[in-house]
Each structure stands twice: as structure tokens, then as C-alpha cells.
Amino acid sequence: MAAQAAPELAKLDLNKNTGSVEANAVSAGGSEKEEAENEGDSEDDRDDEQAGGSAEVNAEKKKKKKRPKKKKKTAKVQSSPPRIPLTTLFPNNNFPEGEIVEYLNENSYRTTNEEKRHLDRMNNDFLTEYRQAAEIHRQVRQYAQKELIKPGATLTDIAEGIEDGVRHLTGHMGLEEGDSLVAGMGFPTGLNINHCAAHYSPNAGNKVVLQHGDVMKVDFGVHINGRIVDSAFTVAFDPVFDPLLTAVKEATNTGIKEAGIDVRMSDIGAAIQETMESYELELNGTSYPIKAIRNLNGHTIGQYEIHGGVNGKSVPIVKGGDQTKMEEGETYAIETFGSTGKGYVRDDMETSHYAKVPNAPSVPLRLSSAKNLYSLINKNFGTLPFCRRYLDRLGQEKYLLGLNNLVSSGLVDAYPPLCDVKGSYTAQFEHTILLRPNVKEVISRGDDY
């Protein structure tokens, strides 16, 4: 759940060669008898020498030890579809690090400061979990880009293909109680087409097919022990949309560059907007300015809490507003959205995304279906977002009444799809960054974006 709506909508990782023995012929001389004797002697000598040579060769062979056959090393290559758990490919848990960016200006001392380096080394488990999740995200999205996301594919096949890959690579299929809380999907796969910017995932029975002229945002999360990597990209098959994708990708990279310890959110937002809105898209002879979607934001990420929980912070993508500063040790989803429409999203279409409200007050539930469903949500997802397909996968049936009751009771939040005006096109790019004590790490960075 990459997108965090602005306040007004927030409510809603690979035989020694032996020489031959030669006998010397005896020179002719003397009588024929002597010649015969000498000839016989030489043959005997030759036989002796050959016998000696054979024994010597056999002795050498016995001395030589047979070298054990080298075991073939297993190539560190993921299968297609991705099914090999990442811990099998990286048995020592030395997962690839993300892009390391040194702090600049007044924070440049942090790169070499020994105290900060010591604090960073203390976060070993934290980094290992995040890097594992990030490498799973990279491997699954690369597979999705090559094999799943094609014109003619259904959104259901794409979403389930991504989610099956994540579950196999984490080693947690999520069918046993509590298994999804150990590792797995950080939130449901968002497949947002054209004017829809965020929070759309196919529900059961969805028949939507991806078209050649579509612009689709692919947004999914991977978690290990609640450490969520949140990253998204946009796919368009028609090159006419390249300026839109470039604008948003560059805006996200600007946000990543500007982010850092003690940096004000408003400064990041202003830089993002300036970059994005320097582009325009020409479509059917008409030029459309690319606008930053002003009521969508980046956000902090907490353990098991995609939007950082009660004390979460937002990262705007337009100028003005929040003067809050980023702090050491925080994790952020830096994401930007661009649109050819109004640059403002509203709730639209059927809801698929839900999440339990953290620290919600105790509320008496009258419906037994709501009570049972709430217990299942607690045991299998906790505060991690889920979608209706995940409930179907756990064998739940006829749960909508109970689910709606949990939403109306304030125990579960519903996250409807967020859309700009119909006919417009939107794009999104997103990375998870860690503000480590001595460096900034773009944990989800890959060769693709």
C-alpha cells in the first residue's frame, strides 16, 4: 500500500607420464657363439629392464591418490517462475545491499564518524531483514516484467503470479495460522490502470484484461519479520507515454536525493513538484502538463505498519505545508504520482484493500461473523494490509457483512481505489529508503529503476 492519501482521504529481494624403458643392443664381436650368448644375454637384460619398468610404473600408480570429484556448485540463479527460497540462494544471509548514498552538506560528517558507524553496525538484524525483503522484491518484479505483465493478461493472473512468487521466496505460503506474519506480502498487489492511481487490486471474479494502450502502476510490498519493503513502478507499452513515466521516475529520484536526516518535508515536496511539472505529454496532438497529484504522499514505514502507525509522517510531493523534519533511524517510502488530469484523486470503484486499525479501542461486536473474522485477521495479518482474495485463500466465505461491520465499528480501515478524472493517465514510482546513522540506503533500488 504504497500510497498514503492526504489527511482528508486518510480517514476513509551465486597420470604422471612414465617414460618407456629402452634396452641397448649388444655390439657384434667375437664368435657366432659369443654373439648368440651375448644376444641371449641382451634379451634377458631387456626383459629384466622391462619388468623393472613395469613394477616402477605400478608403484607410482599405487602412490597416487585418487582426487575426489568436485561437487558441482549450484548456480545462484532464481527459477522462472520464482520458486527457490532466497535463503537457499544466499545460505549465509549475505543479501545484496541497496544503493548506498553518503550524506551531504552538514550531515557529511556522519559518513566517517566512528560513533555513527558503531550505531549502524548495531542494526545488523534490521538491515538483514530489510535486504532480504528487498532482494525478493527485485527478483519477483523482474519476473513479472518479463513474463506476467503483457497485453492480454488478466489482472488476477498478474496479481496472483506476483504474490505466489513472494510467498515462495520468503518460504512462507501463509496458509497456516500466523505464517503470513513471519514473512510474506507486505500488502496486496496494486494494479492501477490509467486514471486509477492507487489501491486497486482485483477481487474474486475480476475479468479485467490489460490492454496495449494502458498505463499500469504495479505496487506491492514484501516483509520479513514486519520489515516492509514498499516499491512500485509503472508499465506502458505505447512509447507515447514515455514522458509521463520519465517525469514521475525523475521526480521520485529527486525526492530520494533530497531526503535525509533533519531535512524538512516541505523542501522535499517542493523539489519533487519542480522536477515533475517540468514535463508534458503530447497525446493525439494535444499537450498535457504533467501534474503532481497533490493529495497523495510518501510516508514513514513502521514494523508491521505500512504508514508508520499513529506517529507516522507524510512526505508531500508538492510545495508548501509540513515543516516536520526527517530523523535518524527512520524508514521512508519515497513515492511520487503524476497525472495528465486534475492532479487530485478521489475514492472510486470497488474496495479491495483493508487493514486492521492499530491500537483500536475495544468495541463490542454483535455479529458472530464479524467476531470470527476479526479473530482471523488478528491471527493472520495483524496490522498488515490484506485484500478480499487473501480471505478467499484462507477459506472464508460470505464474509462481506462481517467485514463491513468491522469497518463501520472502526476496527478495520477500508482503502478504496484512488482515481483522478476518467480519461486521464497517471504514473507512479516508489522506493523504500533507510536513514541509517552514517549513510542513506535506497534499499529497493534495482537495475530496472
UniProtKB/Swiss-Prot annotation:
Keywords from the named record: Aminopeptidase, Cytoplasm, Hydrolase, Metal-binding, Protease
Top EC group: hydrolase
Residues involved in substrate binding: 199, 307
Task: List the biased-composition ranges (Basic residues).
Answer: 61-75
The reaction(s) annotated as catalysed by this protein in its Swiss-Prot or TrEMBL entry are: Release of N-terminal amino acids, preferentially methionine, from peptides and arylamides
Q: Give the cofactor binding note.
A: Binds 2 divalent metal cations per subunit. Has a high-affinity and a low affinity metal-binding site. The true nature of the physiological cofactor is under debate. The enzyme is active with cobalt, zinc, manganese or divalent iron ions. Most likely, methionine aminopeptidases function as mononuclear Fe(2+)-metalloproteases under physiological conditions, and the catalytically relevant metal-binding site has been assigned to the histidine-containing high-affinity site.
Task: Output the InterPro entries linked to this UniProt entry.
Answer: Creatinase/aminopeptidase-like (IPR036005), Met_Aminopeptidase_Type2 (IPR050247), Pept_M24 (IPR000994), Pept_M24_MAP (IPR001714), Pept_M24A_MAP2 (IPR002468), Pept_M24A_MAP2_BS (IPR018349), WH-like_DNA-bd_sf (IPR036388), WH_DNA-bd_sf (IPR036390)
* Record GO terms (molecular function): initiator methionyl aminopeptidase activity; metal ion binding; metalloaminopeptidase activity
EC numbers for this chain: 3.4.11.18
Location within or outside the cell: Cytoplasm
Q: Where does a divalent metal cation 2 bind?
A: 230, 299, 335, 430
Binding annotation for a divalent metal cation 1: 219, 230, 430
Q: Where is the composition biased (Acidic residues)?
A: 34-50
Q: Name one GO biological process term.
A: proteolysis
Q: Any keyword Metal-binding? A: yes
Q: Provide the residue span(s) of the region labelled Disordered.
A: 1-91
Report the cofactors.
Co(2+); Zn(2+); Mn(2+); Fe(2+)
A GO cellular component annotated for this chain's UniProt record is: cytoplasm
Q: Which family does it belong to?
A: Belongs to the peptidase M24A family. Methionine aminopeptidase eukaryotic type 2 subfamily.
Query: What does the record give as the function of this protein?
Result: Cotranslationally removes the N-terminal methionine from nascent proteins. The N-terminal methionine is often cleaved when the second residue in the primary sequence is small and uncharged (Met-Ala-, Cys, Gly, Pro, Ser, Thr, or Val).
Give the protein's recorded name. Methionine aminopeptidase 2
